[in-house]
């Protein structure tokens, strides 16, 4: 036995013979300190269960039209707005391919060798192999048994994971051993925890007893997850926790006697985080979704939903994806609603099918049991106010410049809304070819059979068939600084009406052929803006962009024509430079109009950012427009249209202004106006204010608009943020909607409480309470208000937990 002093050069000991160790285990090599990492990562997954399968709310939104399915067999990732649920960390660092040939390095203040059989290390003892390290006050390594035994301030590290305890024993190559009373830290997540003991059974299996995990500071853990025992199997990528409890400020808020969880990103069956909230129509609302991973391309989510004012609702969503097809089926059913004493239900079917190259079929069917269903059960304002659900199926074909659509489209319309026309069927074809010898050519042909249910008063509106063909040809001439585009369009339409009992004398056949000629032109001038540049200290370029648009269409009386899908467009920039002020194909306005517009912009010369835009436009009608949406004017008047003006200003950092006005020079009054201002000095600081005004007109809508709204997100303290919105209708003297809430960001968790009240379509106001706690690096519980906050507070940014800053050198070994 010889004694050696610490040498400036580390000594490399021969590796033990591989004997009967499997090749796979030999390739893994090294110390099993890395096994601690999936252990604690598993703890981070316990509360979320099969977290990777679903996002946001588990309750489906039975919307009118929705994309069917993400084009990937893998479950969709959690959206950014859901916050940091269970962290998706990389797997432990790749092991050296050296395997059993990897050298073992030792270092200490004093080393005592045993005839090449082993070594005893004292004082800053360290053993390193294949990326892992064991350190301690004293360490003994037996080369024959390949066993390392460490005592006193033992530290095991690998791939950013550090475990500290009083004692550890490991068979290095076999990855067998234990560590007593370990405290562990994770550089990637900032998480930490402790256990009574960790046993490493082999390279894949380990057991932790009385283990805990938190991303809070170990000295001040607001929350932590604990379990009596956790069994991990890295080969099967599954873990089982026994007696798991989530504690928040010392209070248990979630628990389970035993459950399994995944150790990687693969989907696995299990419970998803519960959703909780309160609504004035539903009472206390609790949903506990359960995810079933049927196959890589199929899954099922079952979501029982308990509402104290309604009862127990059962819902489900089935998703599938195959070669050339995908879709989802969703349904929910509430037997014997406590308030209505009736069964309430909703379902949705979406399917996409590829039939051949360029040929696809689709199905989109949505229905609810009654008119009040969206008001009573949907969680969002947009879904609560939805009054029309689509039932549609069709076939599409795309080939080069040609597209074709054949579909049947029906609607379920909820009262008090009136029914819409249904297309049973519609056949539509389009051909679009650009730069055909310098010409742009477009041809659209359509056949539609229109049907409509009786109105609420029992009136039968006109029904019939419509066929049209609309070819157009244009010749764009584009040069540097200017363009001219002449265009000719023909609209040929044929109607075959059904005799209606309400209007037996109405003519049944109509036809119309009308040409439209237009000429669009514009120029762009640029110059430097030295005065503005000196004022703001930035080099600016100013543009001046005049535009002239002329359109001519002869008059044709269309007062007897039906209105299947046509409405009057709102007067604005999109309409004033268009060939037809009506959307749809049932009205073609007579035109002899010239529109002039002028736009000026200020653009940063170095960055190209537009800081200012001002636009003004007006149209002159040489003869007056006789064709109206509901008839024909006998004596139209020539003259100028309303004057349109708008501006967008972002000249000062953090300040934004958008404003527009529609001014009638004849009556000297404003028919429409809006202004919106926003102050955003920095992240999570925003104040918005807006005002809208519209004078009622017989052309568009007799409903006046006179509304203002304010919204804001602003810090109250260093960690607390207030969110609010208020919208009021001055014309009706009533509140439109209001929202108030508080977000609190601690080191390792975020809390949100939000109250929303809005006017629904039928029975006054609806109020909802959202309460959510988000545990950094673990999961979140409660109802998610983030989408509502983004929708109602422009510029809103979710707060996130503010952990103590760390670096890659923290816990560095």
Curated annotation (Swiss-Prot):
CC per GO annotation: cell outer membrane; transporter complex
Sorted UniProt keywords: Cell outer membrane, Membrane, Signal
Keyword Repressor appears in the UniProt entry: no
Superkingdom as given in the UniProt entry: Bacteria
Residues covered by region (Disordered): 1-29
Protein localization: Cell outer membrane
Listed Gene3D superfamilies: Lipopolysaccharide (LPS) transport protein A like domain
Short name of one Pfam family: LptD
Signal peptide: 1-52
GO biological process: Gram-negative-bacterium-type cell outer membrane assembly; lipopolysaccharide transport
Quaternary structure (record): Component of the lipopolysaccharide transport and assembly complex. Interacts with LptE and LptA.
Biological role stated in the UniProt entry: Together with LptE, is involved in the assembly of lipopolysaccharide (LPS) at the surface of the outer membrane.
Record-stated family: Belongs to the LptD family.
Name this protein carries in UniProt: LPS-assembly protein LptD
Upper classification of the organism: Bacteria, Pseudomonadati, Pseudomonadota, Betaproteobacteria, Burkholderiales
């Amino acid at each position: 036995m010889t004694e050696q002093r610490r040498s400036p050069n580390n000594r490399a000991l021969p590796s033990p013979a591989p004997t009967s160790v499997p090749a796979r285990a030999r390739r893994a090599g090294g110390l099993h300190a890395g096994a601690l990492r999936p252990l604690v990562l598993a703890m981070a997954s316990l509360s979320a269960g099969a977290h990777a399968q679903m996002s946001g709310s588990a309750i489906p939104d039975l919307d009118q039209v929705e994309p069917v399915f993400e084009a990937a067999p893998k479950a969709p990732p959690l959206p950014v707005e859901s916050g940091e649920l269970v962290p998706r960390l990389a797997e432990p660092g790749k092991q050296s391919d050296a395997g059993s040939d990897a050298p073992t390095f030792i270092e200490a203040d004093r080393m005592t060798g045993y005839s090449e059989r082993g070594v005893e290390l004292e004082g800053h003892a360290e053993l390193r192999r294949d990326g892992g390290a064991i350190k301690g006050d004293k360490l003994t390594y037996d080369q024959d048994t390949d066993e390392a035994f460490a005592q006193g301030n033992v530290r095991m590290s690998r791939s950013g994971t550090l475990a500290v305890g009083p004692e550890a024993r490991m068979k290095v190559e076999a990855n067998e051993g234990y560590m007593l009373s370990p405290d562990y830290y994770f550089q990637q997540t900032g998480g930490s925890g402790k256990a009574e003991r960790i046993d490493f059974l082999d390279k894949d299996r380990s057991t932790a007893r009385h283990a805990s995990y938190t991303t809070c500071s170990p000295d001040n853990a607001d929350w932590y997850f604990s379990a009596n025992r956790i069994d991990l199997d890295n080969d099967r990528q599954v873990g089982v926790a026994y007696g798991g409890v989530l504690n928040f400020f010392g209070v248990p808020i979630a628990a389970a006697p035993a459950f399994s969880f995944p150790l990687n990103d693969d989907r696995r069956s299990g419970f998803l985080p519960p959703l909780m909230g309160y609504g004035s129509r539903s009472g206390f609302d609790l949903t506990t979704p359960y995810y079933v991973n049927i196959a890589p391309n199929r899954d099922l989510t079952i979501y029982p939903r308990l509402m104290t004012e309604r009862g127990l609702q059962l819902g489900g969503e089935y998703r599938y994806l195959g070669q050339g097809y995908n879709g989802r089926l969703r349904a929910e059913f509430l037997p014997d609603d406590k308030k209505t004493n009736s069964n309430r239900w909703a379902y949705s079917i979406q399917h996409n099918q590829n039939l051949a190259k360029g040929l696809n079929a689709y199905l989109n069917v949505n229905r609810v049991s009654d008119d009040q269903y969206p008001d009573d059960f949907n969680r969002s304002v947009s879904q609560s106010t939805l009054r029309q659900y689509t039932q549609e199926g069709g076939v599409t074909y795309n080939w080069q410049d040609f597209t074709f659509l054949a579909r049947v489209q029906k609607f379920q319309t909820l009262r008090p809304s009136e029914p819409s026309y249904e297309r049973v069927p519609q056949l539509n074809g389009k051909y679009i070819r650009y730069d055909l010898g310098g010409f742009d050519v477009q041809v659209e042909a359509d056949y539609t059979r229109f049907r409509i249910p009786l109105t609420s008063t029992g009136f039968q509106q006109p029904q019939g068939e419509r066929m049209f063909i609309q070819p157009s040809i244009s010749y764009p001439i584009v040069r540097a600084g200017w363009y001219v585009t002449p265009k000719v369009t023909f609209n040929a339409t044929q109607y075959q009406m059904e005799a209606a009992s309400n209007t037996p004398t109405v003519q049944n056949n109509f036809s119309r052929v009308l040409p439209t000629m237009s000429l669009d032109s514009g120029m762009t001038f640029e110059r430097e803006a030295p005065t503005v540049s000196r004022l703001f200290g930035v080099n600016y370029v100013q543009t001046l962009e005049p535009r002239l648009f002329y359109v001519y269409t002869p008059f044709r009386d269309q007062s007897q024509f039906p209105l299947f899908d046509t409405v009057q467009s709102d007067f604005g920039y999109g309409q004033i430079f268009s060939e037809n002020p009506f959307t749809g194909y049932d009205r073609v306005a007579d035109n002899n109009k010239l529109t002039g517009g002028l736009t000026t912009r200020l653009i940063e010369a170095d960055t190209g950012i537009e800081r200012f835009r001002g636009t003004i436009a007006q149209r002159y009608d040489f003869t007056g427009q006789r064709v109206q949406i509901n008839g024909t004017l006998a004596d139209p008047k020539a003259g100028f249209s309303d004057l349109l003006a708008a501006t967008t200003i972002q000249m000062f950092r953090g300040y934004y202004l958008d404003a527009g006005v529609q001014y009638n020079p004849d009556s000297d009054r404003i028919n429409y106006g809006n202004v919106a201002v926003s102050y955003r000095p920095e992240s999570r600081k925003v104040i918005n204010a807006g005002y809208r005004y519209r004078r009622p007109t017989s052309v568009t809508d007799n409903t006046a608009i006179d509304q203002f709204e304010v919204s804001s997100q602003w810090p109250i303290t260093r960690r607390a943020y207030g969110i609010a919105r208020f919208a009021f209708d001055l014309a009706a003297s009533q509140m439109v909607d209001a929202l108030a809430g508080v977000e609190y960001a601690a080191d390792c968790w975020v809390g949100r409480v939000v109250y929303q009240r809005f006017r629904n379509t039928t029975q006054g106001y609806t109020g909802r309470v959202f309460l959510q706690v988000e545990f950094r690096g673990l999961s979140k519980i409660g109802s998610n208000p983030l989408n509502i906050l983004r929708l109602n507070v422009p510029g809103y940014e979710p707060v996130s937990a503010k952990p103590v800053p760390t670096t890659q050198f923290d816990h560095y070994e």
